[in-house]
UniProtKB/Swiss-Prot annotation:
This protein's record includes keyword Chaperone: no
Species this protein is from: Nandina domestica
Signal peptide start and end residues: none
Name by which UniProt lists this protein: Large ribosomal subunit protein bL32c
Molecular function as annotated in GO: structural constituent of ribosome
Coiled coil: none
Matches recorded under SUPFAM superfamilies: Zn-binding ribosomal proteins (SSF57829)
Gene, per the UniProt record: rpl32
Length: 57
């Protein structure tokens, strides 16, 4: 099994952790943006089937 030769420095570990956090942040931001555009009906990249709210009599 491969074993690292030296310990990773604290600064390098912090940089990698921040990059990992930022990827999640941007993914969440894109998801919220898409949800907002779908809810307002302004989405150009996501197709939603519209349902009618007619009352059955």
């Amino acid at each position: 099994m491969a074993v690292p030769k030296k310990r990773t420095s604290i600064s390098k570990k912090r940089i990698r952790k921040n990059i990992w956090k930022l990827k999640g942040h941007w993914a969440a931001k894109k998801a919220i943006s898409l949800a907002k555009s779908i809810s307002t009906g302004n989405s150009k990249s996501f197709f939603v089937q519209q349902t009618s709210n007619k009352v059955l009599e």
